[in-house]
A protein has these predicted regions:
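A surface/secretory-pathway sequence property marking extracellular, secreted
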Residues: 141-153
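Sequence-structural signature of mature extracellular/luminal beta-sheet repeat domains
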Residues: 130, 148-150, 224, 237
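Catalytic core of carbohydrate-active enzymes
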Residues: 1-138, 147
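Hydrophobic transmembrane alpha-helix bundles
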Residues: 1-6, 168-171, 180
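Secondary-structure transition/turn motif
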Residues: 111-118, 166-172, 182
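A surface-exposed beta-strand-loop module
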Residues: 153-176
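Mature N-terminal, pre-catalytic/accessory segment of carbohydrate-active enzymes
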Residues: 170-174, 180-247
Length: 247
C-alpha cells in the first residue's frame, strides 16, 4: 500500500480504471503486478501501440499510435516528435500534433501535424481508447476526417468498459470523434470489485460471504464501514475494502 494525495478534481487509475474523487489523501492498495498511476479527468495519454513494437520500430516514429482519453473534463495534449537521432531539434526540426478533448461536446479532435512532417509517416493508424464507457457508446460514435464523416472500426471492451475506435488517416488531416456524454460510466462497479478481491483473498469462505453480504446489503457506506470495522478484520483486508467503497 501507499498514501496518495489526490488534488481537487476527478482521477482515474490508468490500470484498474477505478475512479477517485480528489481533494484528499487516501491509502491505495495494489498487488505485485500493478502500481498506482493516475490520470486526471480529461487526460490524454499517447503511446506507441504495444502490438507493433519490435527492435527496429522503437527507433522510429510509430505508424500506429494508441491514444487513451479519460472523460468528465476538458483536456489537451501536444505530441512532439523529432528524428530520434540528431540534434536537429535544436534548430526547430521537429513536428507537433495537437489533441483536444471537449467534455461538454464529448468530442476528441486530432489536429493536422505541424512542422517538419517528413519526420513522421504520411499516414497513421490511431487506436483511440475512450475510457469508462457504457456499451451504448459503440452505437453513438461519429468519426470525421477533414470535416467529412467516415466509417471507422469500433469495438467495445465490456470487461474494462472501454470503447476502441480505429482510424487510419493522413497525418496532415484533422480527425474528430464524437460520442455522447451520456455514455460515460460513472460508477465504480463496487460490488464486482469487492467480489473479485474477496474471491482471491486468503480468508475463510464464511467470512467472505458475511463481508460480501454486507457490501451488497444496500446500507449506507458509513454503516458498512463501521460494521466491517467491528468485525476486527485484518488491517490490509479492511484497507482494500475501504479504498473500493470510498474511492
Amino acid at each position: 500500500k501507499t498514501k496518495v494525495w489526490f488534488p481537487e478534481g476527478i482521477w482515474y487509475d490508468i490500470y484498474t480504471g477505478m475512479r477517485y474523487d480528489g481533494g484528499r489523501m487516501l491509502e491505495v492498495y495494489r498487488d505485485l503486478s500493478s502500481i498506482p498511476v493516475f490520470s486526471k479527468a480529461g487526460g490524454i495519454l499517447v503511446c506507441a501501440d504495444a502490438d507493433e513494437l519490435d527492435a527496429r520500430s522503437v527507433i522510429k516514429n510509430p505508424d500506429v499510435l494508441c491514444v487513451r482519453v479519460f472523460p468528465e473534463a476538458d483536456g489537451e495534449f501536444e505530441l512532439y516528435e523529432d528524428d530520434n537521432e540528431s540534434c536537429g531539434y535544436v534548430d526547430g526540426r521537429c513536428v507537433t500534433t495537437a489533441m483536444k478533448y471537449s467534455a461538454d461536446k464529448d468530442m476528441f479532435v486530432i489536429s493536422p501535424a505541424d512542422g517538419d512532417t517528413s519526420l513522421i509517416p504520411d499516414n497513421r493508424t490511431y487506436k483511440l481508447v475512450f475510457e469508462r464507457r457504457t456499451e451504448a457508446a459503440a452505437d453513438k460514435v461519429k468519426v470525421s476526417v477533414d470535416g467529412k464523416e467516415v466509417w471507422a472500426k469500433n469495438k467495445y471492451d465490456k470487461e474494462n468498459r472501454k470503447l476502441i475506435v480505429t482510424v487510419n488517416a493522413s497525418t496532415e488531416s484533422e480527425i474528430s470523434v464524437a460520442i455522447s456524454k451520456d455514455t460515460v460510466a460513472l460508477d465504480n462497479q463496487i460490488e464486482k470489485r469487492c467480489f473479485d478481491f474477496l474471491n482471491q483473498a486468503e480468508i475463510g469462505f464464511v467470512l467472505k460471504d458475511e463481508i460480501y453480504g454486507l457490501i451488497t446489503s444496500g446500507k449506507k457506506t458509513t454503516v458498512i464501514l463501521s460494521e466491517l470495522k467491528a468485525k476486527e478484520l485484518d488491517t490490509e483486508l479492511y484497507g482494500v475494502l475501504t479504498e473500493i467503497l470510498t474511492a
